[in-house]
Regions:
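Conserved short loop/turn motifs at secondary-structure junctions
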Residues: 1, 81-82, 158-162, 244-253, ...
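Basic, low-complexity terminal or inter-domain segments flanking catalytic cores
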Residues: 2-3, 24, 150, 183, ...
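Structured, non-catalytic alpha/beta "coupling" segments that mediate domain-domain communication
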Residues: 14-38, 168-218, 382-437
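C-terminal or mid-to-C-terminal helical accessory/interaction module adjacent to the motor/catalytic core
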Residues: 115-194, 245
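Metal- or metallocofactor-binding catalytic centers and their adjacent structured scaffolds
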Residues: 215-253, 448
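Short acidic, hydrophobic short linear motifs in intrinsically disordered regions
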Residues: 239-242, 250-264, 291-300, 464-476, ...
């Protein structure tokens, strides 16, 4: 009896084939075989939004082969990924191959190993049409918004632009943050920090001014700070109280898609799309010495914190065997999954805890190793005992010369801790954790006299909210309910590739084009860029999945309002064209002599002649650097890739093909005199192949205004 098993990717097919016998033919659909054709709307609005699917261009031969294999097989099993998208792919395959939808031909497994695959194959289910409907509803919604709204935005701002149901909200978040930064007015404040030594130790410790006998004091000006310093002239310092305690720090839960993307961004510098690509490779698996062919992690698109009891027991056994029983948490932790989570899968975890990162390293690329290490350590730490710290808080009383023989005094506080038991931190520390070597205080008791070593008054200014990074934007999308685990990476990738947002030193900054699109949508399509409205649509899609609402009724409700808004916007904006700012340059047009201007188009900035339409001359806009090309000596210019990444190349391209991701600097190589470029890890390097000079970049010291008390 022959059986045909269809999965999405060829690599996944190769892995699964190793677990099944010769009677199984495992093949790949290579993603979707049907989709909505891009050339037209492909949705019959008048017929309850019936989608008009077509075979994906270029897959006709593959579909023919799948049909032939299905016709010759005694049984066809659909083993695509276990989520909405995977369910929809299975449904499309069943429809095209003529498989009955009431038969049990859908196979699911959350991890790829022999046990999970054979268990899934042995217990097929029917295709879940609620999951399929939820995916179709999302696809149709996105097509309606994109197909109807994009032409309007293009007509009013610039040809070739696009607007999307979720991407527009993401751009709005970035734009709103930029507006907050622009409107921010910094406020001055001061801190007063002292260094003391105690009788028991020669090593100085830090303490911060907190107030006086009247209570807490916030220092806002230099004058206020100087007044306190005057009070502290010839002061005597003593310990007024010592409070000791114990702090227990718990580990973070295992990863969800969002937290994995955030941590990979923060710790590894990976962009979300790259993280998901590597995670997919780890999920699909490889040969690991001593363990055979196996997937290394569970399914990576999840918002659940749940882990199976089997995985918990395997992890606990590994911890006890390798670290000792004291590193096991006294009772199982059950992390609470948020109410809006789909919870269709476990959290992201290693499939086999015994496959440590070091064991897997030989089978992995450097990037795979880094991400697997992060996932493995995070999961194992979540099972481990708490970190126990002994804390101490010291209050210091300062009585200056003028305050003696009165009830007046100033107060300083110092706090610190020592680690009594490292617990889970032996394996994993969150990216934001403080350094354990800091904050340790000497043995000290109430009444001890302290010796002042130095006193510094430091000027500060309140800081505006930080721009989003890719990780913090994903966190905000998750917190506000916009998007789902399967969409976070594509959202960020889309808004950067379309030049609505650019990356500047890992921060996301809106372009003039992005701001113009958001302004237009805010004025005429407030719901489309409304965070709460978009989140409610995501919630409705979840309800479709759980058979709580009908997806066709949901589409009618959305489209009726959207269509009226679109028609009103067209009427209100008839004849109106939004003109983006054009900066004049000192570059003459070689055709007519006018000074060219910088314009913003679909693919970013370019130079254009202001004499349009009489003169239609355009040319690429390049940003020159001070560096010279190490190959031919030409100028090094800044460029943008098709995906929105910044790189640097020679002005003489294509005659000279020099290109680098490393940022050029003003420094020259002491060996050959050519420009130095800044590589990862703070290394300055000469890129001349015949030179190879490298040195560590010097850190710029931060300057602060201080006042010192002798």
């Amino acid at each position: 009896m022959s059986k045909l098993v269809i999965v999405e990717s060829p690599h996944k097919a190769t892995m699964i084939k190793k677990y099944l016998g010769k009677s199984y033919d495992v093949t790949a659909s290579v993603g979707h075989i049907r989709d909505l054709p891009a050339a037209k709307l492909s949705v019959d609005i008048k017929n309850d939004f019936a989608p008009k699917y077509a075979i994906v261009k270029g897959k006709e031969k593959l579909v023919k082969e799948l049909k032939e294999k299905a016709a010759n097989a005694d049984e066809v099993l659909l083993a695509t990924d276990p989520d909405r998208e995977g369910e929809a792919i299975s449904w499309h395959l069943a429809t095209v191959l003529g498989l009955p939808l009431d038969e049990k031909n859908r196979v699911k497994f959350n991890e790829i190993n022999e046990n999970a695959v054979k268990k899934g194959i042995a217990s097929p289910e029917k295709i879940d049409m609620d999951l399929v409907d939820a995916q179709q509803a999302r696809r149709i919604l996105d097509r309606l918004v994109g197909y109807k709204l994009s032409p309007f935005v293009s007509q009013k701002i610039h040809r070739g632009l696009s607007a999307g149901r979720v991407q527009s909200v993401a751009v709005r978040l970035v734009v709103d943050r930029e507006e907050e930064i622009r409107k921010f007015v910094p406020e001055e404040y001061w801190s007063l920090d002292a260094k003391f030594t105690a009788p028991s130790s020669k090593k100085a410790f830090k303490a911060a001014f907190t107030g006086d006998e009247t209570g807490k004091i916030k220092l806002k000006t230099k004058e206020e700070t100087d007044a306190i310093l005057a009070r502290l002239q010839d002061a005597e310092y003593s310990v007024s109280s010592v409070k000791k305690g114990t702090r227990r720090r718990s580990p973070a839960p295992p990863f969800t898609t969002s937290t994995m993307q955030q941590d990979a961004s923060r710790k590894l510098g990976f962009q979300a799309k790259r993280t998901m690509k590597i995670a997919q490779e780890l999920y699909e698996g490889m040969e690991v010495e001593g363990f055979g062919a196996t997937g290394l992690i569970t399914y990576m698109r999840t918002d659940s914190l749940r882990i199976s009891e089997e995985a918990r027991q395997e992890g606990n056994a590994f911890i006890e065997a390798n670290y000792g029983k004291q590193y096991l948490h006294e009772k199982p932790r059950y992390f609470k999954t948020k109410a809006s989570a789909q919870d269709g899968h476990e959290a992201i975890r290693p499939t086999v805890p015994a496959i440590t990162p070091e064991i897997a390293k030989k089978s992995l690329t450097p990037e795979q190793f880094k991400l697997y290490s992060l996932i493995w350590k995070r999961f194992m730490a979540s099972l481990m005992s708490n970190c126990i710290q002994d804390t101490v808080k010291i209050e210091i009383k300062a009585v200056g010369e003028r305050d003696k023989n009165t009830d007046r005094y100033c107060t300083f506080n110092a706090s610190g801790y020592t680690v009594r038991f490292d617990g889970y931190t032996r394996l994993y520390e969150a990216a934001t954790d403080e350094d354990e070597d800091e904050g340790k205080l000497p043995e000290i008791k109430a009444g001890d006299a302290l010796k002042l070593k130095e006193m510094l008054g430091n000027q500060h200014f309140t800081q505006p909210p930080a721009r989003y990074t890719e990780g913090s934007l994903i966190k905000m999308l998750e917190e506000t309910g916009v998007g789902r685990p399967s969409t976070y990476a594509s959202i960020v990738s889309t808004i950067t590739s379309r030049e609505y947002v650019v990356r500047e030193q890992k921060q996301l900054k809106p372009t003039e084009l992005g701001e113009a699109v958001v302004k237009l949508l805010k004025e005429h399509f407030p719901n489309i860029v409304n965070v709460k409205f978009t989140a409610s649509m995501e919630s409705d899609l979840d309800k479709v999945e759980h058979h709580e609402i009908d997806y066709i009724a949901m589409l009618h409700t959305f489209y009726d309002g959207f269509d009226k808004t679109l028609e009103k916007a067209k009427a209100d904006m008839e004849g109106v064209k939004i003109k983006l700012k054009e900066d004049e340059t000192n570059i003459p047009c070689e055709k007519c002599g006018r000074m060219m201007v910088i314009k913003t188009g679909r693919f970013g900035k370019f130079l254009a002649c202001p004499g349009y339409p009489e003169c239609k001359n355009t040319k690429p806009y390049v940003i020159e650097t001070t560096a010279t090309c190490p190959v031919c000596g030409g100028k090094v210019i800044q460029k943008k890739s098709k995906k929105g990444y910044t790189f640097f190349g020679c002005e003489n391209y294509p005659e000279c093909n020099f290109m680098t991701w490393d940022k050029p600097t003003d420094e020259k190589c002491p060996k050959c005199g050519k420009s130095l470029f800044k590589k990862k890890g703070g290394i300055l390097a000469c890129l001349d192949e015949n030179c190879g000079f490298e040195k560590k970049a010097e850190r710029k010291k931060k300057s602060t205004k201080t006042q010192e008390e002798d």
